[in-house]
From Swiss-Prot:
Many of the major pollen coat proteins are derived from endoproteolytic cleavage of oleosin-like proteins. It is found in: Lipid droplet; Membrane. This is Oleosin-B2. It is a multi-pass membrane protein. It comes from Brassica napus. Residues 1-23 are annotated as: Polar. The lineage of its organism: Eukaryota, Viridiplantae, Streptophyta, Embryophyta, Tracheophyta. Pfam families: Oleosin. One of its GO terms (biological process) is post-embryonic development.
Length: 183
């Protein structure tokens, strides 16, 4: 029996090439817009920084506005750089997709999936009871650790000869420590 998803994908499989074309158009337009904004932001920030530097030196008593302006210029430079890197990344993704390497077939994806599976302990295999036992074992291991991460020292039993005098002295000291009631 075919699942509902496989029937759906077989029924609408003619749409997938159109979706790829739409993704290509959106990614190319987005990359061009990001690159254009990055050029404007980087150019404007660089010109403003070049113009404002001598003004900051000449009018040094105005430190608060100078700090604000410098912060804005630095954030403009960062925004331009980020937009530029985003645009370049989109273009590289388009080139990779045009070369026939999709994300599903990418060797980088396989590496990432294998790392995730290794960290999760096999990728979800096994029964719930086995996973519960593994978690409880880890908790017991953590509970047995001392403050410095070392195993907790085992408590040594007190010798019977030393424990007997202490047990006899304790009841005699208890009545003497009780406060007397005032009349």
């Amino acid at each position: 029996q075919a699942s509902i998803f496989s029937r759906f994908f077989r029924m609408f499989s003619f749409i997938f090439p159109f979706v790829n074309v739409i993704k290509l158009i959106i990614a190319s337009v987005t990359s061009l817009v990001c690159l254009a904004f990055s050029c404007v932001a980087l150019g404007g920030s660089a010109v403003a920084l070049i113009v404002s530097t001598p003004l900051f030196i000449m009018f040094s008593p105005i430190l608060v506005p100078a700090t604000i302006a410098t912060t804005l210029l630095a954030s403009g430079l960062m925004a331009g750089t980020t937009l530029g890197l985003t645009g370049i990344g989109l273009i590289m993704g388009l080139v990779r997709t045009a070369g026939g390497v999709s994300l599903l077939q990418s060797p980088l994806r396989k590496i990432i999936v294998n790392r995730i599976k290794a960290r999760l302990g096999g990728g979800g295999g096994g029964s719930r009871l086995a996973r519960l036992k593994k978690i409880l074992g880890l908790l017991n291991k953590l509970r047995g650790m001392g403050a410095g991460g070392a195993a907790a020292p085992a408590a040594e039993p007190a010798p019977a000869a030393e424990a007997a005098p202490a047990a006899e002295a304790a009841p005699a000291a208890a009545p003497a420590a009780a406060p007397a009631a005032a009349p």
